[in-house]
């Protein structure tokens, strides 16, 4: 009995030590993606004028600053190199709400 209690307590303690991740609101991310005009240059699985989101997610996978880099890209409109070699200004997301932009970045990374 004591062993079961200790095992349960240890398992519970381990779950508390895991980082807390909020679930991505996919519906809101897809809406912001569409409203921002992102689908003109990007899709989830096919390269268009810009890279597919799956390629972007793979590029940043496992990198601690991946989400922050995407948030910067979605808010600061930097010059980006297109798949065809040209450069142009990346369009910012159609919101100033940091939580919505972060949700969109997390959705892209989840692809």
Language-model segments: what does each one mean?
Residues 46-60, 73-105:
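Axial heme c-ligation environment in periplasmic c-type cytochrome domains
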Residues 46, 63-68:
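Alpha-helix N-cap/helix-initiation sites
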Residues 5, 25-26, 66-70, 83-84, ...:
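Extracytoplasmic c-type cytochrome modules immediately beyond a signal peptide or single-pass transmembrane anchor
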Residues 35-36, 77:
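Structured helix-beta-strand junction loops
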Residues 18-33, 59-63:
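Electrostatic cytochrome c docking/interface patches
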Residues 37-44, 104:
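The canonical Cys-X-X-Cys-His
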Residues 1-26, 105-111:
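Post-cleavage N-terminal segment of exported redox proteins
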């Amino acid at each position: 009995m004591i062993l079961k209690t200790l095992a349960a307590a240890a398992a519970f303690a381990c779950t508390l030590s895991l980082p807390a991740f909020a679930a991505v609101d996919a519906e809101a991310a897809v809406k912001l993606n569409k409203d921002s005009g992102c689908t003109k240059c990007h899709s989830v699985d096919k390269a268009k004028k810009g890279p597919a989101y799956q390629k972007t997610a793979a590029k940043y996978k496992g990198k601690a600053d991946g989400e922050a880099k995407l948030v910067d890209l979605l808010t600061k409109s930097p010059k980006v190199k297109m798949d065809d070699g040209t450069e142009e200004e990346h369009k910012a997301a159609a919101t100033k709400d940091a939580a919505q932009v972060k949700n969109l970045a997390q959705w892209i990374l989840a692809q």
